[in-house]
Amino acid sequence: MSWKERLDNPTLSVWPHDYLRPHAEPFVEQGTYSISIPQLSGDYATLLAAWTALLYRVTGDDDIVLYVRDNKVLRFTITPELTFTQLQNKINEQLAELANVEGTNFDALSESLQKESGLERPPQLFRIACVTEDLQLDRYTHSPLDIGLQLHESSSDVSIVFNKLLFSQDRITILADQLTLFLTSVLQNAKQVFTKVSLITDSSTSILPDPKANLDWCGFVGCIHDIFQDNAEKFPERTCVVETPPINSTKTRTFTYKDINEASNIVAHYLINTGIKRGDVVMIYSSRGVDLMVCVMGVLKAGATFSVIDPAYPPARQTIYLGVAKPKGLIVIRAAGQLDQLVEDYITKELDLVSRIPSIAIQDNGTVEGGSLPSESGDVLASYTELKSTRTGVVVGPDSNPTLSFTSGSEGIPKGVLGRHFSLAYYFSWMAKQFNLSENDKFTMLSGIAHDPIQRDMFTPLFLGAQLYVPTQDDIGTPGRLAEWMGKYGCTVTHLTPAMGQLLTAQAVTPFPKLHHAFFVGDILTKRDCLRLQTLAENCCIVNMYGTTETQRAVSYFEVTSRSQDPHFLKKLKDVMPAGRGMKNVQLLVVNRNDRTQVCGVGEIGEIYVRAGGLAEGYRGLPDLNKEKFVNNWFVEEGHWNYLDKDLEAPWKEFWQGPRDRLYRTGDLGRYLPNGDCECCGRADDQVKIRGFRIELGEIDTNISQHPLVRENITLVRNNLEGEKCLVTYMVPRFDKPELENFKIEVPSNISDDPVVCGLIGYSPFTKDLKAFLKKRLASYAIPSLIIVLPKLPLNPNGKVDKPKLQFPTVKQLELVAKNSSIDINDSEFNQQEREIRDLWLECLPTKPTSISPEDSFFDLGGHSILATKMIFTVKKQLNVELPLGTIFKYPTIKAFAAEVSRLKSTDKIEEETTALTADYASDAASLIDTLPKSYPAARALGSPSEMAGPTTVNIFVTGVTGFLGSFILSDILNRTVTGVNFKIFAHVRAADETSGLDRIRKAGTVYGTWKEEYANSLQVVIGDLSKKNFGLTDDKWSHLSETIDIIIHNGALVHWVYPYSKLRNANVVSTINIMNLASEGKPKLFNFVSSTSVLDTNHYFELSDKLQQSGKEGIPESDDLMGSSLGLTSGYGQSKWAAEHIIRAAGKRGLRGSIIRPGYVTGASYNGSSNTDDFLLRFLKSAVQLGKIPDINNTVNMVPVDQVARVVVAASINPPCGDDLCVVHVNAHPRIIFKDYLYELKNYGYDVEIENYEQWKKTLEEAVIERSEDNALFPLLHMVLGDLEDSTKAPELDDKNAITSLRADIEWTNEDRTKGMGATPEQIGIYISFLESVGFLPHPKHFGDKALPNIKISEQQKELVASGAGARSSSAA
């Protein structure tokens, strides 16, 4: 392997550093820190292994790239479960391989790569080193090192050589201690898993949070509404709220503490007297202003829980919030307008309101009106005015719920977070002291009115006795106006989201020097955001507060000093502000992802948990999610703090659950800085995959924000017009910069009202410049496919970027762009072959890009996998070259694709991948066998029901349950009613949480007509990543699974007929090994694998089948060792199933028991045809109707109804046919049908189809699809059907004695004999056609045929779902 191949697209790991990377000379200032490690004794390989371990721990990068001794570069993949010994062995293997490779001049290599790839500058190849010779960080101009180790081989001394412009001395000192600590530990015990060795040094113990510390669990300071009432009685005439006037008015509305207190007392007494009880939810339909504060205080004084609906939300969305909240009371603020009729209807039908204030408004004189109800005359609040000075006397405690706030949830359903009174007031005294807040401050009401930060806006001044200023909507929404408002009214403290901060500074010129603190919440805060704000507010300290709705007021903080105090403070910081450290009695615990009993050391990436007494109570109505996200602190024993309140006597004691040491699992990744602050490193789930590449959205946005003409930006994953995922950046440029005019062209006046079209056309030169800018910083696959320039980013009512409004452009918009754009092409960039390919691509692409270069990818230019099929055929026809469809996936850029076309034309043959690939899958399987356990606990079959003693629960772990076959497997199991036996399914699902996982199962079952709601009682959803060790589950969850499960059915797979083995390996092979590992631990388990007859698709088995048939035998025996296809399989899918089977057989020799079940084509349900419409055979039916022709192919088809396949799978899993062995179970059709006869059944039911010679049929199809661009269901599969379908549809005959054995034993479990099997009779095909016609997949027959379509039963809901495309998912098995 050449150095170019070794260093293709390397991961440039970034060791956490303290200072911004310099962008001008000098780039490097070398520093050295030396330590002595006597135990090391000059052992370079051990030091390299330790350095690699630390690199993985601090970056999380599994692609390790290190500059090593002898002027070489080491590159390999690391996994977190390795012991240190295994890591050493892996590195020794790599070093041994490198020993035979000559070093090179890496600057020359960078320059060569630059030239080959047309890059603007030579690429950097590595950043981190471990050597034995003298280390110079700047040895290579194009690959300067950030940090490295130098081992002095003649001694035990090690030097850390580092760039002092990046790393602080404190960090290097801690790193030296961590290296010493790690080596000391692993040299004493090399069998430790390297990710579980503690990195907390003695020197860092004092700066990191102690997870066992007492965080004042019993420190309740009282309820915010009581504190407010006390303040109102102390200083009743002090100004409380100021509503500033709109632009066309001079009328300011000012309200005192007495006004607010009395008005809210009236509201509270009304609520209580109309039936609101302690803990009831009262929903407020609100506007921004004093009325909201009155309503909130009134609800709290009544002992109830307030929640807010913003009228800016669509009515349908409002009903969703109401459905989650289930309020007992409703208050409509007059200024918010009337409820939409849709909302009123929902309230009438779905809610049980006991109290309603129809139109509340506080008057200028402080009196309050509530409006009148239809059933009553007069104002609803009028009779309660006499109670305006009377407290309600309702007692609530620290664990009562004052707030219900919403946060995003799965399937578009928000989650309601119940707050606690403990948190609302606890932190204000500390904040006042820490940030110099007082009764003299003027706060602002800028947060979204339905967003939980609005609580800070209101409660902070009420606690302090300060003032709250309220702007108009015009003040907020007009660029530049909000800054004027801040300056005019002398506001001193504000709470903002970063998006609202950008709105405050956008086009602003008016300074507001009286602002001394701005608290930011809700999103990442960048240096750019801070600089813009402090340019206008030089006396403003900026506080970045990290927390979530679920942590309530319990947050961390990082303070940015004001410009007037330290003009250079921001210059020293990196681009994203750190989260900082916890406020009073709040901890950010960064927990080791591989051993949650450990807090991470400085620099180490882990998952952030928030520990505090002020966490929210949890999610309303979601107990399972609460268990997952709000967890008891495992660092102390449960009940450890109970002694603290044993003598507590308080009137609110009954509303107090006692000291609870809980953690909130944020899902964010973070690391500690050398001073103990914490910085966020992205989401544990914020990485997306597009075309197989792992992409970090935050990294893309950070790089885009560094372009000098970018003001705001956000990158999202969006589905393009064909439903494929792509990256789209939405961006607001620096309109105030004159240089922007150089990157702008005129937009036709007839389309100037569409901002998306205007942005795509008018700023196309700018987006081209930005893409060129990104090519220097990002891998090609991470560059957004589309960059859309907008005048501003839309904000939701909460002040955050409104992501749902940022969508992929419509067909009409893209057509307008294409019609009014010229393509910017520099012809000199392309060679002759590249020009040909470029022009052919442009013919195929649905919309023309504004610019194109040799490095552009087909997919980034707007192509997709279906379009790729058409493009490949066009290239084959026009350039007369034989081209496999997979070429475009392997060579996606114009440059690479053209080079491959040139190679094929010159050699006149397709690249001989088959031998390499076939060798790969067999040898890869052999190597993976070495990773298996030496033995598996021997499981025994359940036996017959009559043999089972007493009531028994059979626990079955099933994968692929949301797929076609998986839905039927699930229903087959749960439909069994055997006395004394209960089945429980542990269903693996990919989802955000268990609730959304169950929703996915329910929806899939509904689509395929199998779901019954009672199934939910017998289901346990398992959320995990099958490609990771232990599915990425915690040790506790994994242990519970391994000790509980009796039977495993691994049915999940990635089915793709184009992807090569390498792309399917993780999903179909590695995942299988990880699931087998479940069988190796805990209780003995039967392991059952749903494979595919595609493992038999070689000439060997076709010939063997013919030979066996001629001698009177059934077909390929189930006992065959499958070595006849160890070479020769041509589909990546078949290869991946073969590899998995081969590994499972090896495990069987080590004690694994169970079955390998091999279905062929899995077709619709026998009784009503319910089908997965994205199916080869069903597409062929539709294509035949569209084309009017069917090919004359006489192969038999092994197609079996899905309910029969599911029965065989479950029967073999419960009743393994080979007892104490592991064997194969064939699913064979009885009877089989000839391919053309299957299709010709259409004729019998009134469809116009004729049989045509296969070669003529191919020509007819190609002309229709390629030349006339007619729709055809086979379009995505043209590469297959226009190849050699006569060969590819061959299916060897199969012996299925094992299947019959299991089905016979299964009769006692089901009271049904399925041993005769099922297949494809003409009657069965009629049921399929009837189903497809009823869901709209096939048109209604044009005339009466010889047969009438049979009547079938399917629900209207199923019809709607299938018709909408929900049934067109890939099968879990094929």
UniProtKB/Swiss-Prot annotation:
GO terms for molecular function: L-aminoadipate-semialdehyde dehydrogenase activity; phosphopantetheine binding. Transmembrane segments: none annotated. Keywords: Amino-acid biosynthesis, Lysine biosynthesis, NADP, Oxidoreductase, Phosphopantetheine, Phosphoprotein. Heterodimer of an alpha and a beta subunit. NCBIfam families: AA-adenyl-dom, alpha_am_amid, Thioester-redct. Its EC number is 1.2.1.31, 1.2.1.95. Catalyzes the activation of alpha-aminoadipate by ATP-dependent adenylation and the reduction of activated alpha-aminoadipate by NADPH. The activated alpha-aminoadipate is bound to the phosphopantheinyl group of the enzyme itself before it is reduced to (S)-2-amino-6-oxohexanoate. GO terms for biological process: lysine biosynthetic process via aminoadipic acid. Residues 828-905 form the Carrier domain. It holds the Pfam family NAD_binding_4. Pathway: Amino-acid biosynthesis; L-lysine biosynthesis via AAA pathway; L-lysine from L-alpha-aminoadipate (fungal route): step 1/3. Belongs to the ATP-dependent AMP-binding enzyme family. The keyword Oxidoreductase applies. Its cofactor is pantetheine 4'-phosphate. Binds 1 phosphopantetheine covalently. InterPro entries: AA_adenyl_dom, ACP-like_sf, AMP-bd_C_sf, AMP-binding_CS, AMP-dep_synth/lig_dom, ANL_N_sf, Far_NAD-bd, Lys2. The keyword Oxidoreductase applies. This is L-2-aminoadipate reductase large subunit. Signal peptide: none annotated. The modification O-(pantetheine 4'-phosphoryl)serine is found at residue 865. It is an enzyme of class 1 (oxidoreductase). It catalyses: (S)-2-amino-6-oxohexanoate + NADP(+) + H2O = L-2-aminoadipate + NADPH + 2 H(+); (S)-2-amino-6-oxohexanoate + NAD(+) + H2O = L-2-aminoadipate + NADH + 2 H(+); (S)-2-amino-6-oxohexanoate + AMP + diphosphate + NADP(+) = L-2-aminoadipate + ATP + NADPH + H(+).
